[in-house]
Amino acid sequence: HVEKDNPPQDLIDLNPSQSVPTLVDRELTLWESRIIMEYLDERFPHPPLMPVYPVARGESRLYMQRIEKDWYTLMNVIVNGSSSEADAARKQLREELLAIAPVFGQKPFFLSDEFSLVDCYLAPLLWRLPTLGVEFSGPGAKELKGYMTRVFERDSFLASLTEPEREMRLGRG
């Protein structure tokens, strides 16, 4: 765990933006979640988390960009904005996720029969929704909650959680 106002010296030395996550692999240092995720998928390609075909890979990258630009931006407003800004962002995030909820019911994972990097990108946001005060009911809630359950029950997802993340939903241990 890294405190934003007190980053460790090795992070300062490795990463000029001092952001987390930061990955060091041999002589390479990377930061920014999506860059790290794509690198790891290429470094450890079995099973692949990005589609094999270039068009599908491009579409996946667009989905991840949209998730970042639209939903992670709203999450940031919820966490760091004023009370009224947070309330508006919370409402917008809930409405946008419910609006695309049918997508979550079409296939086991995000527009795919296979777990993909898009799911990896979306999962941390969805995991934090209760902490952010975003809850679902009504049309679309069943599909969205079903998708979340499928992702959150994966051994790989559970193994990826830090202790603070685990405590967000699971309590201690």
Language-model features: where?
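Hydrophobic alpha-helical segments
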Residues: E38-L40, H46, S82, P130-G133, ...
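Acidic/histidine-enriched, glycine/proline-rich intrinsically disordered or flexible terminal extensions
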Residues: E163-G173
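Poly-acidic low-complexity segments
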Residues: H1, D10, N15, E135, ...
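GST-like fold's C-terminal all-alpha helical module
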Residues: Y63, I67-S160
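Conserved residues at the C-terminal ends of beta-strands
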Residues: R26, A123, E163
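GST-like domain detector, emphasizing the conserved glutathione-binding G-site
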Residues: H1-P102, P108
